A protein has these predicted regions:
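Glycine-rich phosphate-binding loops that contact phosphosugars or nucleotide phosphates
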Residues: 3-103
Length: 103
């Protein structure tokens, strides 16, 4: 899961996981979902609320942010960490950023 280009990467990776590794996976990149949750919970919280609504403790979340500072992605990483939900974070621009410190 990510924003902008990171969302596109997440979407492509999820297809590869399903096609090659036969792993059931999905992304929360549906415009209706994003706009509904962002409207109801604020943009910085929509990913956390989507995780609460659609996930189980068996899920693994991959959160991507080039900068590592996207508030909605960082909040989701912190929520996963706090609730013992398996998590992988990917970020790139700076080594020490809030996202890399969460995952």
């Amino acid at each position: 899961m990510g924003n902008g280009g990171s969302s596109s990467i997440a979407s492509h990776v999820s297809v590869d996981f399903a096609k090659v590794a036969k792993v059931n996976c999905s992304t929360f990149n549906n415009a209706n979902l994003i706009t509904c949750f962002a409207n109801d919970y604020k943009y910085e919280n929509w990913v956390v609320e989507a995780i609460k609504a659609y996930s189980s403790k068996k899920d693994l979340f991959i959160l991507i942010s080039s900068s590592g500072t996207s508030k909605n992605i960082v909040n989701a990483a912190q929520y996963c960490k706090k609730n013992n939900i398996d998590l992988i974070t990917l970020s790139g621009f700076k080594k020490n950023n809030p996202l890399s410190q969460s995952g």
